[in-house]
């Protein structure tokens, strides 16, 4: 990807003997100057990475020994940017602005009537999951966050550094039982988990629920003929220097899947469902209905296999008065998982005694480790995050809430 570098920032921090390089930047479209959210930021051939936030911004912490490695920024529809880490170093004190050019339109992007249909492409992709995804044990280091909102006001925040072990991407016998083993490295939360409205959210382990939403890992795709016939092929795009199939489904729910033309690996998917009207639960003279779900899952290739890169899920539940059927309040749960390190073919396991429990992470927190979080790859805050902070800090600063 060709970038125009406007200004830059890169500094080295020391914690004991360990040195960390931090690259701060902004990725945006060169022509429109619009930010590019969830672009992948990584080191070529290495297992670490992060993603840009909704404003295209990122802070990428990496070992100082990587200064001679190649920084890579990838985005669907754009050509890759690659440059040595040392070459983007600057002491100006300002984040670097990366202006990205879209990939040129190719003749192959024109869909010909006698080529593969969208359903054909998706069918092949689903049949090749075990070829394209890891079939040996692996570890993922990641950052998890969830926020809860009631009537437009954020009431709680929870963040965790996690380690995830999985045997492989073999199709599970039970798609509703978590196969991964998760170890909690650090957990921090706001005091909002004591808010009276938290009882109107699921009290189970929400990270476990999120992992079970991985459509590829848990084979959560319809694959009958009627469904596949409804899948449409869209104009091809580009990612990581090669062409990508794009297929969509619009009946009853929205689905958009990006599939690598070289090997039919699913690299990205987006899905959204609307209100169903079905009653979810009843409580204290009220009942709740499902108001919709929006999900994004992104994968990144490492050593020839696809590993989850990031995942976001937004789910909405509305609560009504049982007697009058009037809307009392709306709730929204937002969850995100960023994978910042992959360890393939691992010999390390997560023991049963180390596994997170199946109840809520808010009950599994531990003393706040400020030094750890200072150099940990999280998703950079946005103005939306600052709205979250404003809501949560009405009593005391969030940092103090973490410490408490």
Show which residues each predicted segment covers.
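Structural motif
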Residues: 22-36
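Hydrophobic beta-strand segments
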Residues: 39-43, 56, 71, 112
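Short, acidic Ser/Thr/Gly-rich low-complexity loop/linker segments typical of extracellular
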Residues: 47-57
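A short, solvent-exposed loop/turn motif at the edges and junctions
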Residues: 72-83
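Surface-exposed, low-complexity/disordered segments
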Residues: 82, 96-230, 237-242, 286-404
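Extended beta-strand-rich segments in extracellular/periplasmic secretory proteins, especially
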Residues: 216-271
